[in-house]
Amino acid sequence: MSLRRRKRASPTDLYKTCLQGGDCIPDVKNKFENSTIADWLLKIFGSLVYFGNLGIGSGKGSGGSFGYRPLGSAGSGRPATDLPVTRPNVVIEPIGPQSIVPIDPGASSIVPLVEGGPDISFIAPDAGPGIGGEDIELFTFRDPATDVGGVSGGPTTISTEESETAIIDALPSATTPKQLFYDSYTQTILQTQVNPFLNNAISDTNVFVDPLFAGETIGDNIFEEIPLQNLNFSFPRESTPVKPGRGLRTPAQRSYSRFMEQYPIQAPEFLSQPSRLVQFEFENPAFDPDISIQFQRDVNSLEAAPNPAFADIAYLSRPHMSATSEGLVRVSRIGSRAVLQTRSGLTIGPKVHYYMDLSAISTEAIELQTFADSGHVHTIVDDFLSVTALDDPANIADINYTEDDLLDPLLENFNNSHITVQGVDEEGETVALPIPSITNSSKTFVTDIAENGLFANDTDSLLTPASTIVPAINWFPLFDSYSDFALDPFFIPRKKRRLDIL
């Protein structure tokens, strides 16, 4: 019968049992009575080092003698109220009515300028001509035609009796004198620009382009000629370029580290089917190269790889594309070698970075051909004619063609050739009958009876006309009696038909 294991009581219940006279467990008693090793060390070093009210001990944390206080609280007192912000008082100066200045009728009509004049106190007196605070001359101009009449400026009234005619001397009112400021340093420069191309009346402006004449500049050259420099602006090659301060985030960029072996690959199977570089297998047309490949490798067995660079490879990642500094496209794969194997079956090995740079696509070069010689052709461009080509009449007069230049020479050569006559025979096959050339002279070889050798008799190619040759034997007809066929269909035997009568 198996005994059931009972769970131990809590430390609080065990300590209460100890106080009531029960069994006292040493670790529980020392914890509640603060007699552990940590408490003894605090009591010994407490006289030498003061830790404050930190409450360090084996008991529960109480937060010191004053307990914990929430963060951000201002204490148990009354929170301070915000002081009111008062706007400073602005001294208001009262403005009363201005005093009325009486005008004497006998005073001068020229009113001196007191208010409204320009303030030139801030300008230095030695600032230069036209800029400093020099004395400005003041001139007063009066119109002599209107400067007549009384002092008061009103009309003169004459009183008469009722029977007499009233004569009123109407005088024009006095005008205010004009005051002008005159500055001797003020100069006005009028610039007039004449541009003949802005005239709307000129509608047929012809421009003649001739590379044999150089341009002329009218007036002073106000432009400064400086050597130009190439600014070498760099434009992004991608639609979303990566910032210079951005870290390495792509797997292809993280593969360039000192803890990873770099291995360039030139085999074309690295792009189509990289598994053929690790193990011997047949070519699979349905293989997807954009996947990760896992290989079953036994560390204890020795297996050769088709490519020595992929020996002991247990894992190949999917391809990653990146750009090199030369502007080429680089295909990268991360491989893991199976070197060590633990007891649990975990395979450990270094990582290798395999990469292959794709060649750049060169631009197509198209060979251009010259259609005509334009050495003596001039071009005139104007508003009405787009392009007009004119030839020099003097050059045309010097060109003379003879009749021999106009003949088209035949490049065919019929030397050592003969005529062939073709025909079709009874069976429908084509038969070619060559006709020998008459100009070819025949050579006859006669065997020498003597023992001195073989002599050839060369006939003369020149034919000498001779007289009529009379044969010594009379001609007689020749009948062919040995022919084995007859051309007349009558002589062909007929085949008899056999009729069966039922």
Swiss-Prot record:
UniProt GO MF annotations: DNA binding; structural molecule activity
Family according to the record: Belongs to the papillomaviridae L2 protein family.
GO CC terms: host cell; host cell endosome; host cell Golgi apparatus; host cell nucleus; viral capsid
Locations listed in the record: Virion; Host nucleus; Host early endosome; Host Golgi apparatus
Major localisation: virion
Disulfide bridge map: 18-24
Post-translational modification: Highly phosphorylated.
Biological processes per GO annotation: microtubule-dependent intracellular transport of viral material towards nucleus; symbiont entry into host cell; viral penetration into host nucleus
InterPro entries assigned: Late_L2
Pfam families named among the record's database cross-references: Late_protein_L2
Taxonomic source organism: Human papillomavirus type 48
Keywords: Capsid protein, Cytoplasmic inwards viral transport, Disulfide bond, DNA-binding, Host endosome, Host Golgi apparatus, Host nucleus, Host-virus interaction, Late protein, Microtubular inwards viral transport, Phosphoprotein, Viral penetration into host nucleus, Virion, Virus entry into host cell
Motif Nuclear localization signal mapped to chain: 1-9, 493-501
UniProt protein name: Minor capsid protein L2
Assembly with partners or alone: Interacts with major capsid protein L1. Interacts with E2; this interaction inhibits E2 transcriptional activity but not the DNA replication function E2. Interacts with host GADD45GIP1. Interacts with host HSPA8; this interaction is required for L2 nuclear translocation. Interacts with host importins KPNB2 and KPNB3. Forms a complex with importin alpha2-beta1 heterodimers via interaction with the importin alpha2 adapter. Interacts with host DYNLT1; this interaction is essential for virus intracellular transport during entry.
Functional description taken from the UniProt entry: Minor protein of the capsid that localizes along the inner surface of the virion, within the central cavities beneath the L1 pentamers. Plays a role in capsid stabilization through interaction with the major capsid protein L1. Once the virion enters the host cell, L2 escorts the genomic DNA into the nucleus by promoting escape from the endosomal compartments and traffic through the host Golgi network.
Gene assigned in the entry: L2
